[in-house]
């Protein structure tokens, strides 16, 4: 069958830069699904994305669907003809539906009888007849949170559409997509190259756009070019560019023809904390900061122009002029804020609401202070430093710098605390209280910082759950999932001796009578245990491994972690599957027995050699396991328990558990209960599949 290259390009106004890659990839994924569902065989699908276009190029697309034989079974012969051999109404109706007469139908004979049969060869539809609808369907399923209308049309898309190009080989496919008739015309760069030009064939794309339109349509090629040139530009001035992937992606999505340039700002601004300067360079201006080999900020920045200008110096001067007032603002705020101590902002926190039912930021600060001190005591941190850091934790929110540059909260508290002569551990804790800010982020470095970070997050969790505003579905306005996972990560990875139950109880107690939800403690603990499930699944642990541990509901995160890792290791042992099945069998037997079990196994009632051996093994193991359980050495404990495989197998093969003699039966059930209880010291392995 003939194969050709297919191209679709949707020319738009500037697309949202932070969504450009995801839109293009979703377009490709959706269209691949459409082609596969339509039975159109194809080769690789390349996606292209630039600020004003989304495009797909499909290699080796079949010219048509394959022909296929269709069969439609009709009525049974007994129902298809009457006593005189004439077709019944059922047979005639079926034949009409197939477009034939009854006498044209074939007959299908099977061991169950004979039926009328219609058999025909259905020719596959041409690709050009199918493609417009497939493109439209793929576009309609893009992940667009907000759609736009433009002109007087009811058509909606992420941005207004100006051109649509559909080419199959050299043939232009007529269609109207998103209200725009298709054509061969595509648009080039706004200020360089040709404004519009015609494509002769799909294979010319994207090279013709590069040569005549001065647009690099290949997203990853554009990104690689920016990265390479920015690294080289930084090296030329003896520095290293901060090319964070998120900003690199955003800049890639803003330019069609990237030109990397280097600019400067006055060295006097380096007296301002680097975080504030970087915030305005990266956040407001989309510039890449430059650091020296020691990690110190240089008075330079790298930016990406969207035009290859004859007068690059003018563009550089323009960008330097734009950033200067922002840096001057930061300098002014920094000087002004330091005219008073950080602690002087405490009274002003009373005028800022944390949450209507939960009081002001000052109220929250007082709770954090008390809770941080309590946590510090539990984990062996300096209580005085933890309470001091808790007291100052929100003071920087009232500074000019943080008001203007919101992402500098915490870090500016650290700088102002240092200026005031606070202890270094207190100052660092003010910055690290927000850690981890996102998945994979660093954790607080000191125990004091850990205490404040946990206190802040637990106060929010207790308060919001206490007024019944817990996350619902995808909505989590107070970022409670992130807060819960942050607490768990800190406690687990820092191996802190904290219990979620007592921690939550203390956080709730500090609210006094403000919380109306009577089950708030249980709700918060259950929510946090649920976060464990998500966390360990992402780490690659099996769902039933996590469920086995959750069945025991251990509320000490470090202990929970040890159990999960122990069960994951246990699963790799050759004895695991048999012992998991045995535990399931034991659980079922005990659930159905209805007998009241004894506290201890009575040796005099043990009759069979297999039950005597199992009982002896349990006694020996109990002595070995007691210190392992006490120290949380669950992996070693499960390895020891794995030695029970043969005694357990022998027991079930040779012993009748539900004996007629009541005392013997109860003794055997008690023995099995002792066996199960040993495993339950770690997890309920009966749930393992």
Swiss-Prot record:
Its EC number is 6.1.1.14. GO terms for molecular function: arginine-tRNA ligase activity; ATP binding; glycine-tRNA ligase activity. GO terms for biological process: arginyl-tRNA aminoacylation; glycyl-tRNA aminoacylation. The keyword ATP-binding applies. It is found in: Cytoplasm. InterPro entries: DALR_anticod-bd, Gly-tRNA-synth_bsu, Gly-tRNA-synth_heterodimer. Its main location: cytoplasm. It catalyses: tRNA(Gly) + glycine + ATP = glycyl-tRNA(Gly) + AMP + diphosphate. PROSITE patterns: AA_TRNA_LIGASE_II_GLYAB (PS50861). It comes from the Bacteria. GO terms for cellular component: cytosol. Keywords: Aminoacyl-tRNA synthetase, ATP-binding, Cytoplasm, Ligase, Nucleotide-binding, Protein biosynthesis. Belongs to the class-II aminoacyl-tRNA synthetase family. Tetramer of two alpha and two beta subunits. This is Glycine--tRNA ligase beta subunit. It comes from Edwardsiella ictaluri (strain 93-146).
């Amino acid at each position: 069958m003939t194969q050709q290259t297919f191209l679709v390009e949707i020319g738009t106004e500037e697309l949202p830069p932070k969504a450009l890659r995801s839109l293009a990839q979703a377009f490709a994924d959706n269209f691949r699904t459409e082609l596969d569902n339509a039975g159109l065989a194809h080769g690789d699908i390349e996606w292209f994305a630039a600020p004003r276009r989304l495009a797909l190029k499909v290699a080796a697309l079949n010219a048509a669907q394959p022909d296929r034989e269709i069969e439609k079974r009709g009525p049974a012969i007994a129902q298809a003809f009457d006593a005189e051999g004439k077709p019944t109404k059922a047979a005639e109706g079926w034949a009409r539906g197939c477009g034939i007469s009854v006498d044209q139908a074939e007959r299908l004979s099977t061991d169950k009888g004979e039926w009328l049969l219609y058999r025909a060869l259905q020719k596959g539809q041409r690709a050009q007849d199918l493609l417009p609808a497939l493109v439209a369907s793929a576009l309609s399923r893009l992940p667009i949170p907000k759609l736009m209308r433009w002109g007087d049309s009811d058509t909606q898309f992420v941005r207004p559409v100006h051109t649509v190009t559909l080419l199959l080989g050299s043939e232009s496919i007529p269609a109207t997509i998103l209200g725009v008739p298709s054509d061969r015309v595509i648009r080039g760069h706004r200020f360089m190259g040709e404004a519009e030009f015609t494509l002769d064939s799909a294979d010319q794309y994207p090279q013709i756009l590069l040569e005549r339109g001065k647009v690099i349509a290949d997203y990853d090629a554009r990104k690689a070019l920016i990265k390479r040139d920015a690294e080289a530009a930084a090296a030329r001035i003896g520095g290293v560019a901060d090319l964070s992937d998120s900003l690199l992606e955003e800049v890639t999505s803003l330019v069609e023809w990237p030109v990397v340039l280097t600019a400067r700002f006055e060295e006097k601004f380096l007296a301002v904390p680097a975080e504030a300067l970087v915030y305005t360079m990266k956040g407001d201006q989309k510039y890449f900061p430059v650091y020296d080999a020691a990690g110190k900020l240089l008075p330079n920045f790298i930016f990406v122009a969207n035009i290859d200008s004859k007068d690059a110096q003018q563009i550089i001067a323009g960008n330097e002029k734009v950033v200067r007032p922002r840096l001057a603002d930061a300098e002014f705020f920094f000087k002004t804020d330091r005219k008073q101590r950080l602690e002087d902002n405490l009274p002003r926190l009373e005028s800022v609401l944390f949450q209507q039912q939960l009081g002001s930021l000052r109220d929250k600060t007082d709770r954090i202070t008390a809770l941080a001190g309590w946590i510090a005591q539990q984990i062996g941190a300096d209580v005085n430093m933890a309470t001091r850091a808790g007291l100052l934790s929100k003071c920087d929110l009232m500074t000019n710098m943080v008001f203007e540059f919101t992402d500098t909260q915490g870090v500016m508290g650290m700088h102002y605390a240092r200026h005031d002569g606070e202890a270094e551990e207190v100052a660092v804790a003010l910055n690290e209280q927000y850690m981890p800010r996102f998945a994979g982020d660093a954790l607080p470095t000191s125990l004091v910082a850990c205490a404040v970070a946990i206190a802040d997050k637990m106060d929010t969790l207790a308060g919001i759950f206490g007024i019944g505003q817990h996350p619902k579905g995808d909505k989590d306005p107070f970022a409670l999932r992130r807060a819960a996972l942050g607490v768990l990560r800190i406690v687990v990875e820092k191996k802190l001796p904290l219990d979620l139950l007592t921690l939550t109880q203390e956080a709730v107690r500090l609210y006094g009578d403000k919380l109306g939800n009577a089950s708030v403690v249980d709700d918060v603990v259950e929510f946090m245990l649920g976060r464990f499930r998500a966390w360990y699944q992402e780490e690659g642990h099996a769902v039933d491994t996590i469920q086995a541990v959750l069945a025991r509901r251990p509320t000490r995160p470090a202990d929970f972690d040890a159990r999960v890792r122990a069960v994951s290791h246990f699963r790799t042992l050759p004895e695991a599957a048999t012992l998991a099945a045995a535990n399931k069998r034991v659980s079922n037997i005990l659930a159905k027995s209805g007998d009241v079990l004894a506290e201890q196994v009575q040796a005099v009632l043990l009759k069979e050699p297999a039950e005597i051996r199992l009982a002896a093994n349990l006694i020996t193991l109990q002595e070995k396991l007691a210190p392992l359980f006490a120290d949380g050495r669950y992996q070693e404990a499960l390895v020891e328990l794995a030695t029970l495989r043969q005694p357990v197998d022998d027991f079930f093969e040779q012993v009748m558990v539900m004996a007629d003699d009541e005392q013997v039966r109860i003794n055997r059930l008690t023995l099995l209960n002792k066996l199960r209880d040993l495993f339950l010291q770690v997890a309920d392995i009966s749930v393992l599949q």
